[in-house]
Swiss-Prot record:
Residues 15-138 are annotated as: Acyltransferase. It comes from the Bacteria. Pfam families: Acyltransferase, AMP-binding. The keyword Acyltransferase applies. In the N-terminal section; belongs to the 2-acyl-GPE acetyltransferase family. The active site is at H36. This is Bifunctional protein Aas. The keyword DNA damage does not apply. PROSITE patterns: AMP_BINDING. Keywords: Acyltransferase, ATP-binding, Cell inner membrane, Cell membrane, Ligase, Membrane, Multifunctional enzyme, Nucleotide-binding, Transferase, Transmembrane, Transmembrane helix. Its EC number is 2.3.1.40, 6.2.1.20. It is a multi-pass membrane protein.
Length: 719
């Protein structure tokens, strides 16, 4: 009777909804594993699960007075994770057919993300051979019973949902020592809990996600700042978004791809969200690609209009682009302010009260945004992402990293770069964190100073950029930083070492591709391993396809919610080419994406990048990684830049050409380093060419297309 009353009361106050199949809860040998976000979680499980479970309650809590008062109403057993007998008792209860609820985190989350998972919970699941049923509680973290004070906008009676996820199991790991088996079982359960979070994520568009972030963190919460040093709150960002969206209606049609050539600035974020709100598809134009690269992108995506800024073209010395590219209409943001009518203002203020009504009808699976590949190996391709794929990647990042509303991101990578867009804009905005948008990653003295001045806690970039920041920074500039993330190129040992020695900070290396929105794997404090790029993100499937001549690893293929909708190619403008990849049996499977990267997995699931499949040379029948050659050069000359290309060789098929900015780099020095590292002599180039400056892409990566042209020109000249 008491439970029935509280069930009615909770349903009335919190409008509780239970989703998922409750049938598996009545099976034999059931272990229920909810996330833990508030003091209400135990009551929610007791009141709304269709079974009467036994709760495993940690000893420190079970001895409290309120737990003794609840003893007549619920069954619980004290759990001391340091004592094996506690675990044995739970295994026995599961074996007897009693459903057991255990909170694997062992404590209420203080970040909103998953905390560490205690190994004992995973070991109970494996030892008892239980059916594991993950449960995801959403909304309770917004109550005053959570521990997220100051991180979310807490309220009296938020809506709470309980998601019962499909059952799974955890097999007993194969390891000689019990300690290792416990650890591995705990890691398996951690993976289950992360997959549960991904499975329970809401279906929403980018604009709806922004609205929900505003509601969750408060409209007066600062979320965005740029070099004007006038922070935007969620409310002021929403105002700008509505303004831009209203004006874009006059210059474009629904479902039209519109080019955006804008710097890292607050208004750029408003333009992106304003465009998707009104059903336009922003195409992020890479202004460093030059006239030829931009023309290819415009053709592939069938872009008719590019929105930019006069001030941006002035400061970036980019007027030649608008003068030479005449196939599109150029619209300048400065001109739009004068076009706002009284009717427009009324529309904007009305929708500021009800922003959801400003969004045109669309689905999460619809195309939301177009990015372009770097063009490092040919013409840029348009990569079409849906709302779902972009938001899935944000949620994957939030699932493994404990970013909170207390964090502040320094985002200097351009927004046309997938790394800069997803990690540098969408992730902080939708996590309640603040982000400082800076227009250039090349200002090596300014960026560290701004990290210090604006109290940033998260910084990310390529290995090249991070190395330069470290050299120019004061040892105290990064005293508040807790996450340093490297991606887009291989992390160099010298960069890693200077960050550790000078600032006491560990760089967390990740791996991503534009087609995956972009993050695929990343090292995080709870799961990091030197020499790897972390584990594959939750909700993704990965497989390796054998490559002839490559002994270790294979071509990485991926499938998951963050995979693109497809390519737009200049050869077939406007036609979407959906992803598909040949499986190991040679059959093309839709939905899979072939990265073209050669990787290997270690026994713990960490990813080791061997190189691009296209960046291997076949010399005298042996496969040689061009990245390995560049690593040799960096080991000899860490302060300079090096890049390898391939040329034809009549005797051996192919030969290596090393371009370097070090005039004193010789083959003898490289050969000596190769011998010390056990690298075969085939990997030591005979053709070494000095350049004062390597041609670079906007991301800071070497422009291999330009380097290959240099090689081809010389071969043509000698021919």
């Amino acid at each position: 009777m008491v439970l029935k009353f509280f069930r009615w009361l909770f349903r009335l106050l919190f409008r509780i909804q239970v989703y998922g199949d409750t049938g598996p809860l009545t099976q034999q040998r059931v272990l229920i594993t909810p996330n833990h976000v508030s003091f209400l979680d135990g009551a929610l499980m007791a009141l709304f699960l269709p079974v009467r479970p036994v709760f495993a309650v940690y000893t420190s809590i079970s001895q409290q007075w309120y737990m003794r008062a609840l003893k007549p109403l619920i069954d619980f057993v004290p759990l001391d994770p340091t004592k094996p007998m506690s675990v044995k008792q739970l295994v026995r209860l599961v074996g007897e057919g009693r459903p057991v609820v255990i909170f694997p985190e062992g404590r209420i989350s203080i970040s909103g993300s998953l905390m560490k998972i205690y190994e004992g919970a995973g070991f109970v699941a494996a030892k008892s051979q239980a059916t594991v049923i993950p449960v995801r509680i959403e909304g309770a973290e917004l109550t005053f019973f959570s521990r997220l004070k100051g991180l979310v906008k807490r309220r009296l009676f938020p809506r709470i949902s309980i998601h019962i996820l499909p059952p799974t199991s955890i097999p007993m790991p194969d390891a000689p020592k019990a300690r290792d088996r416990r650890k591995m079982a705990g890691e398996m359960l951690h993976q289950v809990m992360m997959e549960a979070r991904m499975a329970a994520r809401p279906r929403e568009t980018l604009f709806e996600a922004l609205i929900n972030a505003q509601k969750r963190y408060g409209e007066s919460k600062s979320c965005l700042e740029d070099i004007n040093f006038k922070p935007d709150t969620y409310r002021s960002l929403m105002m700008k978004t509505l303004f831009v969206g209203r004006i874009l209606d006059k210059y474009s049609a629904p479902r039209e791809a519109i080019g955006l050539m804008l710097p890292n600035a607050s208004i750029s974020a408003a333009v992106i969200f304003g465009a998707v709100m009104r059903g336009r598809i922003p195409a992020m134009m890479n202004y460093t690609a030059g006239v030829q690269g931009l023309t290819s992108a415009i053709t592939a995506a069938q872009i008719k209009t590019i929105f930019t800024s006069r001030q941006f073209l002035d400061k970036g010395k980019l007027w030649h682009l608008s003068e030479q590219i005449t196939s599109v209409r150029w619209v300048f943001l400065e001109d739009l302010k004068g076009e706002v009518t009284a009717k427009d203002k009324a529309w904007i203020f009305a929708h500021l009260l009800m922003p959801r009504l400003a969004q045109v009808e669309q689905q999460p699976e619809d195309a939301a945004l177009i990015l372009f590949t770097s063009g490092s190996e040919g013409n840029p391709k348009g990569v079409v992402h849906s709302h779902k794929s972009l938001l899935a990647n944000v949620e994957q990042i939030r699932t493994i990293a404990d970013f909170t509303a207390d964090d502040k991101f320094m985002s200097a990578l351009p927004l046309f770069h997938s790394f800069g867009l997803t990690v540098g804009l969408f992730t902080p905005l939708l996590t309640g964190a603040e982000v400082f948008l800076y227009p250039s990653p090349l200002h090596y003295r300014v960026v560290p100073e701004l990290v210090y001045d604006r109290n940033c806690t998260v910084i990310f970039g390529t290995s090249t950029f991070l190395g330069h920041y470290a050299r120019f920074a004061h040892p105290y500039d990064f005293h508040l930083v807790r996450y340093v993330v490297a991606g887009a190129e291989k992390l160099q040992e010298s960069t890693k070492q200077i960050w550790q020695d000078k600032f006491g900070l560990r760089i967390l290396e990740g791996y991503g591709v534009t087609e995956c929105a972009p993050v695929v794997s990343i090292n995080v404090p709870m799961a990091a391993k030197p020499g790897t790029v972390g584990r594959i993100l939750p909700a993704m499937d990965a497989r390796l396809v054998e490559v002839p001549g490559i002994e270790q690893g294979g071509r990485l293929q991926l499938k998951g919610p963050n995979i693109m909708k497809g390519y737009l190619r200049v050869e077939n403008p406007g036609v979407l080419e959906a992803p598909a990849a040949e499986n190991p049996q040679g059959v093309s499977e839709p939905g899979w994406y072939d990265t073209g990267d050669i990787v290997a997995f270690d026994e713990q699931g960490f990813v080791q990048i061997q190189g691009r499949a296209k960046r291997f040379a076949k010399i005298a029948g042996e496969m040689v990684s061009l990245e390995m050659v560049e690593s040799l050069a960096l080991a000899v000359s860490p302060e300079k830049m090096h890049a390898t290309a391939i040329k034809h060789d009549a005797a051996k098929g192919e030969a290596l050409v090393l371009f370097t900015t070090d005039p004193e780099l010789t083959r003898e020095k490289l050969a000596q380093q190769a011998r010390s590292k056990g690298v075969p002599e085939l990997a030591v180039p005979r053709d070494i060419r000095f350049l004062k400056q390597l041609p670079l892409l906007g991301s800071g990566k070497p422009d291999f297309v330009s380097l290959k042209k240099l090689v081809d020109q010389e071969e043509t000249h000698h021919a």
